[in-house]
């Protein structure tokens, strides 16, 4: 039988109804507007986010600035999925389950009633470098913001409950001065459970390498250990470390790591000290201070050097931590606000000095925050570090908005400002560190959440 002839192109076109075009147009528009919601509904997101088992809450009353999204971070937004039981978890068996809420995506909400969580005058352990009120900051609006995740609420920070769950345990912060600030913030938050000075102690080693807060009734300690690169470096002196030609020794994680052994919860951080240029020097062999050819060094990209240190940190955790009983956290890079042109500031050469409001652009990303470092972390965690249950505290985006929260000029100045500097305060403003109480208390609310409600 002869096959019927194929339809002509004219016949084909005649069969296409105008409603088809309308349907296609509708589907494209629907996909554009609601594509992300569909992906969440169908569970097709490639990157897992954490689940929280406390009740969702409304955003609350007050000013809301701004709404951060995972898309603005270009890096890991949360902890990688871990199928084993997470120690210290208070929600069920502590295993990662279905996605419910990304606590790092949300907005800042003004909260006059409940903020700050403590007063500067009530925490005797705040160092002079972070005590902004004591050094003349005239307003405290920066203390009165609460982080509101999209779709849920952070659990209320309960100092007594935290210490009770950490009874007989050691919590250790390891890193640079930003890590020390987070450590100090947590100590201040915990004082609500140990108001009696006789029931607590705080000590710093003579070399300032280590500080330890002890809550005697709980037999619990919160500690800080200075290691700005995590690896052995030529900036390891906690008191004298203003070195421009910085370098780290390859394979040296154990140099500092021997002091971390036995900790039950470790919170690592390292970032700012790596930012000396596009390349970084690695000491392969020999002493740091050797001249001539007695030492062997190599230059690599800053991202490669950073990834090397991150891999060594993960390897140390594999060898020295029992993931059935201990937890590992990593606090993402803390942003700086040294260039007001980044956020459209009007004054040439301006910075965080005089800033009392946060940045309102949800997509804001400062020029000093290196996306390549965030990518390097993600690549290591998804590659060599896939077997290590490290919880990534992604505080970068929510902190990027907070140009108002830096210590600026309201801190102890170790070198008195010159008359020229006093005439132009922005020239000596600290746009790296954060006032306490303030932003870093939110970092610890997120730590509290991810420790007990992962």
Swiss-Prot record:
Protein name: Probable xylan O-acetyltransferase 9
Native organism: Oryza sativa subsp. japonica
Residue ranges that the UniProt entry lists as topological domain Lumenal: 37-454
Residues carrying a glycan: 219, 293, 394
GO biological process assignments: xylan acetylation
Motif residue range(s): GDS motif: 175-177
Transmembrane annotation, as ranges: 16-36
Lineage, top ranks: Eukaryota, Viridiplantae, Streptophyta, Embryophyta, Tracheophyta
Protein location: Golgi apparatus membrane
Disulfide-bond pairs as recorded: 101-152, 123-188, 132-435, 352-431
Mode of membrane association: Single-pass type II membrane protein
Catalytic residues (UniProt): 177, 430, 433
Function summary: Probable xylan acetyltransferase required for 2-O- and 3-O-monoacetylation of xylosyl residues in xylan. Possesses extremely low activity in vitro.
EC number: 2.3.1.-
